[in-house]
Structure formats: structure tokens, C-alpha cells
Amino acid sequence: MKKITGIVKLQLPAGKATPAPPVGPALGQYGANIMEFTKAFNAQTADKGDAIIPVEITIFADRSFTFITKTPPMSYLIRKAAGLSKGSATPNKAKVGKLNWEQVLEIAKTKMPDLNAGSLEAAANTVAGTARSMGVTIEGAPNA
């Protein structure tokens, strides 16, 4: 077991990581090979379009590293499905978009590996709650 010197969590655009900030300074302070990471990350996420991908990089004492990519943030998936550039500044007053229940289930399926929900139904309710907090109304929800 190699000794871990640091764990860095970043959110990067898929296939477009560069050694510039935030990647360079975050990895540079641990002495990890920045170019090696950006090449590996870009190769692994090239098929994800322009999504923002959270990544957790574990850096070891010998300056080697491993990284785990996660699914895009829920807010990004909701904005994309509803066709929004950003959520509502006042979600309880101003509604900025609509999602139907099928879209909510689709987002829940995408996020399922990263959620601690026991079922797709529970994951869908989590997605619906996040959408409501962004000022997006949900249509056709079974329990709404």
C-alpha cells in the first residue's frame, strides 16, 4: 500500500483539462505530473461532450496518482435538461423552467452511481428536490 500524500477534488470540463489553474496549482503542490493527469483525464472524458466532470485525484508519496471521475453535478444535468443557463435567484418566487417526470427519472439514472439513494424512485425524488430549489417546476410527478 502506497502512502497517500493528498486527495484533490476538482470539477473540470470533460476532455478539456489543461495545466492552467485550477489543475496546475492543485496538483503542483503535491508534485504530481500535471501533464500526465491532463492527458489521462482528457482521454477518459473525451466522449462526455461539454459536461462538467467532478474528479477525485489521490496523490501518493512517490508522486504517482490515481483518479476517479464521477457523474456531472445534478444542477448541471437539470439545467441541461430544462435548457437553462442558470437556476432562479429566487426559486420560491420566480420559476425559470419545467421538467417532466421522465426527464427527472433520466437524470436520476445518470446520477445513481454517486447517490446514496436505495432505489431509482428515491434518487428521482432527490433530483426533483434539487430542481425545485433551482426554481424548476416538475410536471407529472407521481406524489406531487
Swiss-Prot record:
Membership in a protein family: Belongs to the universal ribosomal protein uL11 family.
PROSITE patterns associated with the record: RIBOSOMAL_L11
Gene3D superfamilies, sorted: Ribosomal protein L11, C-terminal domain (1.10.10.250), Ribosomal protein L11/L12, N-terminal domain (3.30.1550.10)
Superkingdom, natural source: Bacteria
Entries under HAMAP family matching the protein: Ribosomal_uL11
Source organism (scientific name): Deinococcus deserti (strain DSM 17065 / CIP 109153 / LMG 22923 / VCD115)
GO MF term list: large ribosomal subunit rRNA binding; structural constituent of ribosome
Record-given protein name: Large ribosomal subunit protein uL11
NCBIfam families given in the database record: L11_bact
Assembly, per entry: Part of the ribosomal stalk of the 50S ribosomal subunit. Interacts with L10 and the large rRNA to form the base of the stalk. L10 forms an elongated spine to which L12 dimers bind in a sequential fashion forming a multimeric L10(L12)X complex.
Pfam name, any one: Ribosomal_L11
GO biological process: translation
Role description: Forms part of the ribosomal stalk which helps the ribosome interact with GTP-bound translation factors.
Gene transcribed to yield this protein: rplK
UniProt-listed InterPro entries: Ribosomal_uL11, Ribosomal_uL11_bac-typ, Ribosomal_uL11_C, Ribosomal_uL11_C_sf, Ribosomal_uL11_CS, Ribosomal_uL11_N, Ribosomal_uL11_N_sf
PTM summary: One or more lysine residues are methylated.
Record keywords: Methylation, Ribonucleoprotein, Ribosomal protein, RNA-binding, rRNA-binding
GO cellular component: cytosolic large ribosomal subunit
